[in-house]
Amino acid sequence: MEFCDESYDLVNIDEFDALWVASRHGVAFGVPPCLLISDDDAIARSSIELKSGPSSSNLSPSTLSTEKTSSDSSGVICDPQLHETWREGLGKFPAKEHARKVARELGADHGIIFLLGQDEKYYEDSDMGPTFRQRRYFYYITGADFPGCAVTYDILRDKLVLWIPRIEPRTVLWFGKVPTPEECKAASDVDSVYYIDFLHEKQCPVFKRGQTIHVLHPDQIPPELDHLGKFIRIDAVRLKPAMDAARVIKTDYEIALIRRANAVSSAAHKAVLRNIKRFTNEREIDALFRGYCIAHGAPIQSYPVIAASGINASTLHYDDNNQSLKNRQLLILDAGAEVHCYASDITRTIPLPGSFTPLAREIYRLVERMQDECIAQIKPGVRFSALHAHACAVAVTGLLKLGILRGEEEEILARGTVAAFFPHGLGHHVGLEVHDVSGTERLLLNGGPGSGPGSGGGYGCGASTWRGYRLRRRVMTKRESLTPWEVAALWEGAKPEKEKQQERWLLNNVPLDEVEAALTLASSSGARGQKLAPGMVVTVEPGIYFLPRVLEKYWNVGGVRIEDDILVTKKGYENLTTAPKGDEMMKCMGESGLL
């Protein structure tokens, strides 16, 4: 091989993509020879650095990670009010505080909590995979957002240890480095950070005879326990409910992240409003929203963007986002970015022509009133089911005035008819999941019709066997939908004329077992969900939707939903969402200019 007047040494690494190229005159570039030899200590302390050369300064990590402050070809301009100084004074991720909360909820004074982080995933028959997403329970007590980790918490010794992978040089070359132990400790208040291969060794002192090991799921039992056999106890039942309960009340650090996610997402909603008259297809709205979030340091969405125009708005989780906006009255934009794994969840209903049609305005004002009145009642001690019942009452009053419903208000509420227009719960918790866990109680309803895995409420139990042990674990779903008879039970409670109510429901062809379950639900105050408490973050998202079988006149309206993220405070609430709505939204849509 000839290279003009120079001579080089070439070393292949993993096919042809990585070479060490050294000139005899001393100029070098590529992978330094020291990184071709496995040196775990060196890898822990350093990352690949480009050798000095005429163009290496242009490729420095600091340059590549600097956020743009001027417009690029997409037309997105970074808002100086959303600069990164929001993290100043935030401190370390409170992993230790979270671990202690879990131990308290667990009610254990000894034992080991063991959690596995997420590994890299690949699509079937492919060397490509989805974007990495850390397991949320693991992140809660570590703050570590990279693959291949584990964590142990010794409850008796109050010692929290993060276990991280060693990375081979060629992996660093292709995918970059992972944080070093020192960097992990600087970012999170874990006690120690070690390499995970030490955890795999039999002489590792973490797991001892006589201990109870708490795991989330039976399939996450560490293989390191094989040599201990029956000398340890495995509990795969209690940890998940304990962690769910701990996650319900957010720490100040968590609230700061949710507030930041709301700030970026609200600004992205405003950017869409200011450009609404320029769009011709739902996909353009989707693209602008996500692009704005990326430009402001929130590249991951909490859930797929819902840009549903016209009749698409009646599909709650519509995400095709590919329909023309021509002749569409309304757009529901349900979108929120996450920041450091913490979610936001924001919905706005936007008039596509720039102003509401008379029919659409009527429905929008009704939903706006439902939300305003419910938010105003939020404070500690209020049961969330009472807020939902109030939203239903406001909806029925409004629908009666519009002539959409006919009859007596009390009778309509008693029958649960409003569920045909407002079929989902008023809200849910927000945190590490957009539909976050709610602890041992559901936010709105506990039990009742449809309880169990994959349904709208309650618990289910799964069981597995490990080395002869029968391991039970509790499964809880998060998203709540409401049937007419559940709404009726929620509204009426237990009434003396129970048999008369049962007769009305049976005449409407409701199955007897579901009627009896709804009546049991109505008679139990403990089944009516959670009372709000300081530190909870919940959505308030009333909606009115129209289907052909309900009312053809409002079919083109599709649906209206307005959603904000609300922090429950000691004396009331704080609305974390600042995206314009109502009259402020209409004013924003009249503003001119780019983003």
From Swiss-Prot:
Q: Name one Pfam family in it.
A: Peptidase_M24
The catalysed reaction is: Release of any N-terminal amino acid, including proline, that is linked to proline, even from a dipeptide or tripeptide
Does the record bear Amino-acid biosynthesis in its keywords?
no
Q: Where are the transmembrane segments?
A: none
Q: How is the cofactor bound?
A: Binds 2 manganese ions per subunit.
Q: Provide the residue positions that the database annotates as binding Mn(2+) 1.
A: D345, E541, E563
One Gene Ontology biological process: proteolysis
Renumbered to this chain, region (Disordered) spans: 51-76
> Might you give the EC number(s) for this enzyme?
3.4.11.9
Is Signal tagged as a keyword? no
Q: Which residues take part in binding Mn(2+) 2? A: D334, D345, E563
* Entry's Gene Ontology molecular function annotations: manganese ion binding; metalloaminopeptidase activity
Q: Any idea which UniProt keywords this protein has?
A: Aminopeptidase, Hydrolase, Manganese, Metal-binding, Metalloprotease, Protease
Q: Which InterPro entries match?
A: Aminopep_P_N, Creatin/AminoP/Spt16_N, Creatinase/aminopeptidase-like, Pept_M24, Peptidase_M24B_aminopep-P_CS, X-Pro_dipept-like
Residue ranges, compositional bias (Low complexity): 52-66
Q: What does this protein do?
A: Catalyzes the removal of a penultimate prolyl residue from the N-termini of peptides.
Q: Family assignment?
A: Belongs to the peptidase M24B family.
The name this protein carries in UniProt is Probable Xaa-Pro aminopeptidase CHGG_02942
Organism, scientific name? Chaetomium globosum (strain ATCC 6205 / CBS 148.51 / DSM 1962 / NBRC 6347 / NRRL 1970) (Soil fungus)
